[in-house]
Structures are given as structure tokens and as C-alpha cells.
């Protein structure tokens, strides 16, 4: 039966079950829950009432979600601050909250993660020429959201350390 046809108490109870089921899997933002309820056909009044209660009860907190999301995705996926902020925005986190959470990843840890990613990827590139390796590594770091200047610097140093005879980036001008 569509939620609109349920009595208000039943509609609220069903919406609450849906939210609790989603929250049992992982933390969610208010916007993620709002969209899930909208997809299931719940009216805005029921959704907003429930989300307000969940927020007041501390079960939904976008700032805490953003902080945990940044730590997890930076550590497990190696995402840069830029990519993390974009993900948080897509999940409905306020820009200011997203920026504050992504700011927890400092430049040094971002550079270290880029180095780890490049080292790991270098081992799996196989026997490719330096230009191909460079192109693939730059694309790889770009997809993770790393700034071009940082990517060039890290790849240049890691290729030297890895044993590349010459580095195509020696003469490159980095912005």
C-alpha cells in the first residue's frame, strides 16, 4: 500500500522503519534519508518531522558523518581533499561542514597518500615505457582528485626512485 494511503501514525511508523533500516547499514546524511523517503513515496511533512526527531535524538548528524566519511575514504580509497568534498556535497552535506571535514586531511598526509598510491600502482604497471607509465599515473591520481602540481611532483620523484632512467617531467613547468 502506498504511504499516502496509510493513516498518519502508520505512515510515520513505516518511514521510521525505513530510516532505521538504512541507518543500521551505515551512517547517513539527512539528505540521503530524505531522498530515500521521497523515493518510497513519503510526503515532505512526514519526512521532515521524522528527520527532525532523528536529528534531535543524535541519530543523524551530518558533521559527524562527514568526519567519519573523510577518514574512511581517505584511508581506504586514497581520495584527496577535493574528491572528498565532492563526495560529501553529493551526499547532501553543507559546503561549510564538508570543507571543515575535508580540512582534517592536511597537505602532508595527502602527499603521503599520493606517494603510496603511486608506489603501489608502479608495481602493477608491468613493462611499459616511461611515457605510458607517466600518463597512466597522472590519470590515476587525477581520478582520485589530486591537484596536478602535486601529482607531477610525486610521480617525478617516485619514478626516479623506482629506477626510471630519465624523467619526462624534468623539463616540465608545474603551475
Swiss-Prot record:
Annotated function: Modulates RecA activity.
The positions making up the signal sequence are none
Please state what the protein is called. Answer: Regulatory protein RecX
**Record family assignment:** Belongs to the RecX family.
Which organism's genome codes for this protein?
A: Amycolatopsis mediterranei (strain U-32)
HAMAP family named among the record's database cross-references = RecX (MF_01114)
UniProt lists the gene as: recX
Query: From its record, what is one biological process in GO terms?
Result: regulation of DNA repair
Q: Which GO cellular component does the record give, naming just one?
A: cytoplasm
Amino acid at each position: 500500500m502506498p504511504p499516502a494511503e496509510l493513516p498518519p501514525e502508520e505512515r510515520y511508523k513505516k518511514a521510521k522503519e525505513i530510516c532505521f533500516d538504512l541507518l543500521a547499514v551505515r551512517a547517513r546524511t539527512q539528505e540521503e534519508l530524505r531522498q530515500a523517503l521521497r523515493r518510497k513515496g513519503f510526503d515532505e511533512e512526514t519526512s521532515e518531522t521524522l528527520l527532525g526527531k532523528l536529528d534531535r535524538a543524535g541519530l543523524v548528524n551530518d558533521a559527524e558523518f562527514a568526519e567519519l566519511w573523510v577518514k574512511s575514504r581517505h584511508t581506504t580509497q586514497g581520495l584527496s581533499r577535493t574528491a572528498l568534498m565532492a563526495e560529501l556535497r553529493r551526499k547532501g552535506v553543507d559546503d561549510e561542514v564538508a570543507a571543515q571535514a575535508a580540512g582534517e586531511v592536511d597537505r602532508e598526509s595527502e602527499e603521503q597518500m599520493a606517494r603510496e598510491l603511486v608506489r603501489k600502482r608502479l608495481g602493477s604497471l608491468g613493462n611499459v615505457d616511461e611515457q605510458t607509465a607517466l600518463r597512466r599515473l597522472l590519470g590515476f591520481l587525477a581520478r582520485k582528485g589530486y591537484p596536478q602540481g602535486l601529482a607531477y611532483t610525486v610521480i617525478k620523484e617516485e619514478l626516479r626512485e623506482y629506477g626510471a632512467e630519465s624523467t619526462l617531467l624534468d623539463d616540465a613547468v608545474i603551475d
